[in-house]
């Protein structure tokens, strides 16, 4: 595998325009509680964000993509193809205590008609929640850096257009968010020691990152 020439780290601040439904699979308080970390704080996993972005780029996991791919050989004479993702996405955490709420729902049958005796409730985060996450691009020898930048720009545009949504119930308008601020920093062999602090949130705050 080619050597990494540069790491580009982006710090993105976001605001949710609609409620968010991100289930943990736990039903302690409702039939579907919000995903929380070990400190009981809500978050959205980086893998979930990455999945939404890949879907927006319309790339299958077997197609060459900024986010990696894996393709099995068609015959014994051929070799498997693949590449690890050049894009890392951190979990999305919230900057302050978001507003929780509980919504009642009813199950639908195959004809999309409500089944009144099958009601359930879900825990959600209300719109207006503020959060942030990191994106990191590893640029290697022979990579098309401009194409990578284009894909990132396309992803950001997709977020702000409401086409990349997070969580469940997206068809009901949930999970819409906008990027309010982006800051980026490049790490090369000239400043690679600084990479140790790349995910230090205080560093980005001290750099004067503010919402648009």
Enumerate the predicted regions with their spans.
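RNA-binding basic/glycine-rich loop and surface signature characteristic of RAMP-family CRISPR effectors
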Residues: 1-212
